[in-house]
Amino acid sequence: MKKGYITQVIGPVVDIRFEGDLPPINNAIKIPMGDRELVVEVAQHIGDNTVRCVAMASTDGLRRGMECIDTGGPIMVPVGKGVLGRMFNVLGQPIDELGEVKDVKYMPIHKKPPSFEEQNPATEILETGIKVIDLLTPYPKGGKIGLFGGAGVGKTVLIMELIRNVAIEHGGYSIFAGVGERSREGNELWLEMHEAGVIDKTAFVFGQMNEPPGARMRVGLAGLTIAEYFRDEEHQDVLLFIDNIFRFVQAGSEVSALLGRMPSAVGYQPTLATEMGALQERITSTKKGSITSVQAIYVPADDLTDPAPATTFAHLDATTVLSRSIAEMGIYPAVDPLDSTSRILEPHIVGEEHYYVARKVQEILQRYKELQDIIAILGMEELTEEDRLIVYRARKIQRFLSQPFFVAEAFTGTPGKYVPLKETIRGFKKIVEGEMDDIPEPAFYMVGTIDEVYEKAEKMK
């Protein structure tokens, strides 16, 4: 064990001098502080036998000359079946007051991404049971999905429904990394997962808003390491939820400024693309298993060209855009069917029928959007017979894209629905081909499959 001593402390940044060999970049160094132990991570070698480190917790109480011990490797987090149903901080210490973690191994949070030979391109759909997603923005198994949305449009509810559906319908594991999250939201999610009965299929890692930037910057990697173990050693298909990827970038920007690096565009860190790549390149499918990641992305001032969301875009396979105008209509999940995209919505991947139905749905909705100005000024009577039909079908499609969620049962009083992909395609095909033209609009709202529309229409007679 190499030992050194503190030479200077500037906020969350600590300089430590070692005689002889210096610990390499990314090594964890422990600083004993009486009843607790502070962990710092080596960020730079600044010459004169000194390393500059970033703290993972508050540096209150540190002083010059204190002894520091190099652990000889990066931060290690617990992995394995023992982490399921538990909640950890960035250092892998349990924060749920349920005692010690049992039945786990420890792995470093820094490692190389899988090589090209090991990778397996994502060309298979992960069925979510959510109609609008499966039809228009199919999620690739082992792909990366971005969830763009403002406050209060339902990002968290959508994430919770996805965790529930994957756990119950697919029997898969989910890892949730709260990066710069509100502690309240983390607590709500924890309680929701208990109520939904899927807590034993889920592991949580949190680095909340109130923690130093070092912790917020590394918590995503800690969650990813747990997911990688399930993929590589247990050969599982895992879901990794990161909320919020923007806070990861923000923490990196704070650390960069503290380390004295010159800022680049819009004041972000010059290493923005490298840091994002180091995280994103490890989230991938291999021949052993897959990691499918759903990442909530906050868009500063609704500007998608801001360096943070713009850098994230380059890595994504599918984008789900949540829209306030759709939420205002009472249609949940409030996914924008025209703004959301998916790389795998191609006929050779999803099949001709799925592709045809999805494009037809978008075509009808796009035409309806164009006609809305005319309707607002002149009314429906001025439209041609053909356009009127498109409007009626579009309104039915809009309502049929809504769906009752399991995790929202307590609020809506409507039991949740899981809709298989085949049923989703069959339902929308009937609408676009005119088979449902004589069924009233309200019958399409908040139902699961198309058969339920018939049942609802019967009751309305």
From Swiss-Prot:
InterPro entries: AAA+_ATPase, ATP-synt_VA_C, ATP_synth_F1_bsu, ATPase_a/bsu_AS, ATPase_alpha/beta_chains, ATPase_F1/V1/A1_a/bsu_N, ATPase_F1/V1/A1_a/bsu_N_sf, ATPase_F1/V1/A1_a/bsu_nucl-bd. This is ATP synthase subunit beta. Belongs to the ATPase alpha/beta chains family. It comes from Caldanaerobacter subterraneus subsp. tengcongensis (strain DSM 15242 / JCM 11007 / NBRC 100824 / MB4) (Thermoanaerobacter tengcongensis). It is found in: Cell membrane. Its main location: membrane. It is an enzyme of class 7 (translocase). One of its GO terms (molecular function) is ATP hydrolysis activity. The keyword Heme does not apply. Keywords: ATP synthesis, ATP-binding, Cell membrane, CF(1), Hydrogen ion transport, Ion transport, Membrane, Nucleotide-binding, Translocase, Transport. Its EC number is 7.1.2.2. It catalyses: ATP + H2O + 4 H(+)(in) = ADP + phosphate + 5 H(+)(out). GO terms for cellular component: plasma membrane; proton-transporting ATP synthase complex.
